[in-house]
């Protein structure tokens, strides 16, 4: 009599991944209903003032385009962005990388203004957020910063669908490789909302179109990432969307241009290394020999 050993390690691994994400989704969904913590803004958690000419060490060369009128301000922004690169490195913790990329995105926002005196109210919030994150990174206080900061009062919640996607991605293993895209998308979305609140849809449309593309690509990547179950992802996204929709304005309305408190999020456990699933061996099945 011959004996055939049947193993199903691949199927077991896939099933365990689904179970892990499903359990996480259940925990997060429960937290959405029970946790009312305010995510706050980085600049509220760690307020920092701007000090002109204090951000370029002697060994760093700022990039200042020819013809720049207010060179000191532009140089400060350039030097801060250079300093953030060390915190964006792959070996850094995921929250450190995320905050560093977000600070860089805020500074990119601010860089569109010619000098500190010309900053709009929205740009001042952007600068304040960047300064606080930079300070937190330099002083090892990054864990004090919210993983998802609130929408500042110069903006409003116009696209709950995009925010729901970004919040959901943060709860999956895809957050690690998508950390820059998520950071850039959050700031760009707030930027678009600020443009809408100040100038209307005509001025904000280009920003929204950009975020639409970024988030759509990020979500597709997340759904194709190992360990992400599509059903659990969509269920969690639906929960976030239900939470956010009441905070959003009606179409073409500026009634929500007063900021918004977004759902509180902890750093996702699934973004960390997990032990490899054990191989499951099925019972030995005796098969009669043909001889």
Where are these regions (language model features)?
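Bacterial N-terminal signal peptides that target proteins for export
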Residues: 4-24
């Amino acid at each position: 009599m011959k004996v055939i050993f049947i193993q199903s390690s691949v199927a077991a691994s896939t099933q365990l991944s689904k179970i892990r994400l499903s359990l996480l989704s259940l925990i997060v969904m429960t937290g959405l209903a029970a946790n009312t913590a305010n995510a706050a803004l980085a600049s509220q958690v760690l307020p920092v003032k701007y000090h002109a000419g204090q951000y370029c060490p002697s060994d760093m060369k700022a990039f200042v385009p020819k013809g720049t009128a207010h060179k000191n301000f532009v140089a400060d922004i350039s030097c801060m962005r250079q300093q953030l690169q060390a915190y964006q490195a792959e070996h850094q913790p995921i929250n450190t990388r995320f905050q560093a990329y977000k600070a860089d995105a805020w500074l990119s926002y601010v860089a569109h203004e010619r000098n500190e005196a010309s900053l709009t109210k929205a740009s001042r919030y952007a600068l304040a957020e960047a300064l606080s994150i930079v300070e937190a990174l330099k002083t090892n206080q990054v864990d004090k910063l919210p993983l998802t900061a609130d929408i500042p009062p110069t903006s409003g919640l116009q696209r709950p669908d995009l925010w729901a996607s970004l919040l959901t991605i943060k709860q999956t293993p895809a957050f690690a490789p998508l950390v820059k895209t998520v950071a850039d998308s959050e700031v760009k979305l707030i930027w678009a909302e600020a443009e809408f609140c100040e100038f209307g849809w005509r001025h904000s449309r280009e920003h929204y179109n950009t975020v639409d593309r970024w988030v759509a690509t990020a979500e597709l990547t997340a759904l194709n990432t190992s360990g992400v179950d599509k059903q659990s992802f969509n269920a969690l996204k639906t929960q976030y969307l239900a939470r956010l929709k009441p905070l959003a304005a009606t179409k073409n309305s500026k009634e929500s241009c007063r900021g918004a408190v977004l759902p509180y999020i902890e750093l996702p456990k699934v973004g960390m290394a997990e032990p490899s699933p054990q191989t499951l061996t099925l019972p030995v099945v005796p098969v009669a020999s043909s001889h």
